[in-house]
């Protein structure tokens, strides 16, 4: 766009210069410098008619700004131009001065350009309003003005949107303690706190009242079988149990002798029985003579049975007769019901616990013992019952029973053959075939029944006697009573 305007501006400049030169040629005389015209009266006085002369107050006395421009030169090079600028507030609103005002611009400061009006009117006459000129082209942008004064504060704006929450600030210092407020409403009971650490032990308190009887504790684990105690004193006889059911009827025993007892006393006369029925009359016989009594005839046949009368009341009991012979033993009856448990008997005497144990070791000076002899275990680890004889290096059995024996032997430089001996009989053997500077362990364990007076020891066989001991390696021999034999009281 600026490239297109450049030729147009150059052409317009040439036309203006040519027109100016022609106008200067037409002028015959040179006008002198123009003096400022008399100013119109102030707005409180009425406007004067054109052509009349009136006396006016100097513009400087009433705040009129007068400016004479000498440097401004128009296109006429021969004559100088002069202009006078007055404030529009000096003149009445009815005074028309729009002749020199550009179109679209309101009343304000105006300038009289005498170069364009000297052909039409004199300098002393105010110009008349002419027809509006054509709209001029848009001028170049003006120089940016200076910064204006700060205007009055505007009305408060609308409330802005809520901003995003800010970050947590640094914790401030602890403030002063405020005044105590009114007591608040009691809060809800909080949860039980965690158990605190144990505090220091307090002083012993006074003896309290005896507490209530506690609940019975849980049943303990069954204890080991103890040795049988001595027989306690017999308890009191328990209550008689209920009679058992009748046993099975035994077989009939042999008939016992029935000797006659002494005659009892005569019983009292019983009451007469009822009268029997009347019999049929017999056939009358003839009158015979009395004969001699004959011999007793045989017993006749029993007559017909008659109905037995009702028995009379029993008579008084007679004296007891003699005891008859015992009959045969009957079969065993059924088992009766269990009787009521008797009272607890008195506590018996406590049994004496029998103890026997030992544990011995080998000193380094006793390494590689001679074969066929008891190994010299002189290092006593446990021998409170003194059942181990360190002089003979043997265990003496004091209480008969079951024993447990074990040995742990360090083997070095030589092979080993060891045996557990009971009364000269080798009960247990161990072998370790080792040569050189290597170190090994040989061990064994056995459960044996011993009687009082038996002896037990450990020995090596032939030249296999690699039993070794040092400050860092031990060889030990141990035994203990598992349980003793029962003793008869």
UniProtKB/Swiss-Prot annotation:
Role: Collagen-like protein, which provides an organic scaffold for otoliths onto the sensory epithelium of the inner ear. Acts as a scaffold for biomineralization by sequestering calcium.
Primary localization: secreted
PROSITE patterns according to UniProt: C1Q
Residues of the Collagen-like domain: 145-204, 205-255, 264-323
Organism, scientific name: Danio rerio
GO molecular function, one term: extracellular matrix structural constituent conferring tensile strength
Annotated InterPro entries: C1q_dom, Collagen, Collagen/C1q_domain, Tumour_necrosis_fac-like_dom
Biased composition (Gly residues): 142-151, 226-235
Entry remark concerning the domains of this protein: The C1q domain mediates calcium-binding.
BP GO terms, sorted: biomineral tissue development; otolith development; otolith mineralization; protein complex oligomerization
Domain C1q positions: 351-488
Protein name: Otolin-1-A
SUPFAM superfamilies according to UniProt: TNF-like
Signal peptide interval: 1-23
